[in-house]
């Protein structure tokens, strides 16, 4: 048997010409008066403050900010609900890690907080979480209360921030 040859229609493709110029990209454009030597944030330095290294305890994610208002808490809880995380409330009398009975880390050194009720699975709105924070404050007026965003798909705590602090330690940071 003789092999058969099939005629095919060949399409011509333009040969590779190399990379295009990046002159059209915004990164490479510079104004005529701009040079690297004129870059400065000196105007902003006057309004910056340095966080003191002693005397103010740092707690959770947002500890560098002033205490959150109810509106701020609503926005944070809305963020964790939109991220598909489950809101949980925890409270503890001492809001930081300490070692009282042993030098090695352990269960009783403040890493674990007491959970308030159950995680709020299926919570559709942040307005359901804030009344629970108020209920913790009524039941236990002195402890710290934090809100946790729990990712039940990855089984991890994704976000944690202080919702309320005991009276008298709002600005001083002394617990």
Swiss-Prot record:
InterPro entries on file: RuBisCO_ssu, RuBisCO_ssu_dom, RuBisCO_ssu_N, RuBisCO_ssu_sf
Keywords: Calvin cycle, Carbon dioxide fixation, Chloroplast, Photorespiration, Photosynthesis, Plastid, Transit peptide
Record flagged with keyword Chloroplast: yes
Transit peptide, start-end: 1-46
Gene3D superfamilies reported in the protein's UniProt record: Ribulose bisphosphate carboxylase, small subunit
Subunit annotation: Heterohexadecamer of 8 large and 8 small subunits.
Family, per entry: Belongs to the RuBisCO small chain family.
Protein's recorded name: Ribulose bisphosphate carboxylase small subunit, chloroplastic
